[in-house]
Amino acid sequence: IDGEIDAGSSTGSVSSILPALNDAFSDATSVGLILKMNSPGGSPVQSAIVNDEINRLRKLHPNKPVYVVVEDMCASGCYYIAAAADRIYVSQASIVGSIGVLMSSFGFTGLMDKLGIERRLMTAGENKGLMDPFSPYSAKHKEFTQAMLKEIHEQFIAAVRVGRGKRLKENPEIFSGLFWTGSHAITLGLADGLGTVDSVARDVLKAEDVIDYTVREGLSDRVLKKFGAAVGEGAARALGNEWLKPR
């Protein structure tokens, strides 16, 4: 996994990660899996699905351990996935953690008042305009949003607690959204030791060969994806305009 975890990512999406996991687990010659991870995080949904799938496959193949090797960073949604592994290896200066959830936007109501700009937003459903940056952010909407983030955060925390078990130190800062170096992450129980893909394969798995199961997009796949997205957006705009015409 390299880069943001997102449904459209070539290496950080469910559609790219799950086939690779299944191929690696189903290969009769494989003695274990190493997930090389370098990501700041991303979608909690994609992360949770991958976490669940790793746990499912581990139960089906109990003799094949799963090890995560963190390169530069494994934060937020990346760690959500990593927590499902048997062990997590890091470099001393890797960035690890950020177990939290955020949602951000901007508010322009003060600027609009100064400029004399009026927002005319029509909705069907009293809360449809939630998070609209040009409308006031009510206490009710803030409370609703915070409750939703808290729920997702609790799901994240539960996954980490299940994955790390007794190795995790009882430190309230662990789930505060802070992140640490790889060395410090080991002391907190967020990681198990120092290691690289080569060292884990050689010293832990005792594997002579390392096979890369990463699902990679070819040039034609990337072109078709972009072409399809462009056609879809154009069709939506065309249909939307057509629906708005009086009849």
Describe each model-derived feature in a short phrase.
Residues 1-68, 72-76, 85-91, 102-247:
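N-terminal organellar transit peptides
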